[in-house]
Regions:
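Active-site region of the double-stranded beta-helix
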Residues: 1-114, 134-155
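Histidine-centered metal-chelating micro-motifs
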Residues: 117-130
Length: 155
């Protein structure tokens, strides 16, 4: 199937969709590759497994659905299994944008914007929160980590 749009989909400073490139296909097997320029700045690859009904970050005090942001990390998320429900917000943009990311589709505010494998990326200082429903999900985050990054205060 052709992608709905092979053009770059983004709101500058908030998010960008990076399309995987079809490499080859055999009976029952599809090979897709990451664009080379996308991989040049990767400094960490995080495997993230959400069990059923997981939320990240979790409840903090009386706040059921808190946000977090990374001042020294750019996130690049690809979902390998299940669905991730992701909310993004930046002060500059001024409103929440919601995404559903699956292994083969990305929805933005309820509209299908990518009908092939894609990576949802967001830069430092973007507030985000992630949820998986009952089936859970598995993803890889190809993180760009910058000077000042410390896992102790990154989350």
């Amino acid at each position: 199937m052709n992608n709905i749009s092979d053009e770059v989909l983004e709101i500058e400073g908030l998010y960008k969709i990076v399309h995987l490139q079809k490499f080859r296909e055999t009976e029952g097997v599809l090979f897709e590759v990451f664009p080379k320029e996308f991989l040049e700045n990767v400094s960490g690859v995080d495997k993230v497994i959400h069990r059923g009904n997981a939320v990240s970050p979790g409840k903090i005090g009386d706040v059921e659905r808190p946000w977090y942001m990374h001042p020294f990390q750019w996130d690049n998320l690809i979902v390998l299994k299940g669905k991730r429900y992701i909310d993004l917000y930046s002060v500059k943009h001024g409103k929440k944008e919601s995404f559903i990311v699956t292994p083969d589709e990305i929805y933005h505010n309820g509209t299908l914007i990518c009908n092939s494998a894609g990576i949802l990326t967001w830069p430092p200082y973007v507030f985000h929160r992630v949820e998986s429903k009952e089936e859970g999900s598995a993803s890889l985050n190809f993180a760009y980590r910058y000077d000042g990054f410390d896992v102790k205060d990154n989350f």
